[in-house]
Regions:
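N-terminal basic/disordered segments at the start of proteins
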Residues: 2-23
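Hydrophobic faces of well-ordered beta-strands that scaffold small-molecule active sites
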Residues: 3-6, 24-26, 59-63, 90-92, ...
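Active-site-proximal loop/turn and secondary-structure-junction residues that shape catalytic pockets
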Residues: 7-11, 30, 63-69, 95-97, ...
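Glycine-rich, proline-tolerant flexible connector loops at the mouths of alpha/beta enzymes
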Residues: 25-44, 63-70
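Active-site-adjacent beta->alpha loops and helix N-cap segments on the catalytic face
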Residues: 36-46, 95-104, 140-154
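N-terminal active-site wall of soluble small-molecule enzyme domains
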Residues: 51, 57, 62-126
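Catalytic alpha/beta core domains of metabolic enzymes, predominantly
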Residues: 109-247
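Conserved small/polar residues in nucleotide/adenosyl-binding loops
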Residues: 249-251
Length: 251
């Protein structure tokens, strides 16, 4: 079973390698869901890949934001550069981006991001027919659900699940609250996490919504803890957190 750790920057990548990760996932300056992380410039990725490969660790690069037309236009040179850098897999959440990656670099593995909300065998079979080698299942699934997904999915399609990390109140992050309240899209990696604010009850005025005066619990769900009982149905366990510190990666 593969242990996949986040690498929000080169320090985190080195830590993940040092403490036994089988693979790391990282984002470049565009197209990743962790826009506030340091991430990697495109010219830094070849050295990061070389370092990881020298230590027997694979590198997966995320391309999992909600894609708009301008985003799609920028994908071919993005995937070509990652291919030239020697990355092992693309993690993709949009079917259009998935198709572009297959056209540009068909020899690079394509993993379906949890943002695609794959939660059943039928969906897994469709992605497999499009060329996916792995699906990262929806974060809302129970261990029993994951076992059923493994049973119903093609045998050669790998299943990855998150074992630790934040749980969004929306289905695999498909939430518009941040966009509505702050103009920053959670589906573009800029979530302000208003589900974790505490709110003051009052009128419909925007001033009635204040993150600094607690009234009750937040809307967010606790982190998953399936790491304590790893089902054999999973090929890979992912640790969520492109923004996580070195200390968490060490643990």
């Amino acid at each position: 079973m593969e242990l996949l750790a986040p690498a929000g920057g080169m320090e985190q990548l080195r830590a993940a390698v040092a403490f036994g990760a089988d693979a790391v996932y990282l984002a470049a300056e565009r197209f990743g869901m962790r826009a506030r992380a340091a991430n990697f410039r495109m010219d830094e990725i070849p050295a990061a890949v070389a370092f990881a490969h020298d230590h027997g660790v694979k590198v997966h690069v995320t391309c999992n934001i909600l894609m708009h037309p301008d985003d799609i236009d920028g994908l071919p040179p993005f995937f070509r550069a990652l291919d030239a850098a020697g990355v092992d897999a693309f993690i993709i959440g949009d079917v259009g981006a998935f198709a572009v990656a297959g056209d540009v670099a068909p020899w690079v593995e394509r993993h379906v991001s949890t943002q695609a909300s794959v939660a059943n065998g039928a969906a897994a079979r469709v992605w497999h027919s499009l060329g996916a080698s792995r699906v990262v299942c929806a974060r809302e699934m129970s261990l029993a659900d994951i076992a059923r997904l493994r049973q119903d999915a093609p045998p050669d399609l790998e299943i990855e699940a998150f074992a630790h990390g934040a749980m969004c109140m929306a289905v695999s992050g498909r939430c518009l609250i941040s966009s509505y309240l702050t103009g920053r899209s959670g589906n573009k990696g800029h979530c302000t996490q208003p589900c974790r604010w505490s709110y003051q009850l009052g009128t419909a005025s925007p001033a009635a919504m204040r993150p600094d005066e607690p009234v009750g619990g937040d809307l967010g769900r606790p982190s998953p803890t399936s790491v304590v009982e790893l089902p054999q149905s999973e090929n890979a366990i992912g640790i969520q957190g492109g923004l996580k510190s070195l200390s968490l990666i060490h643990i």
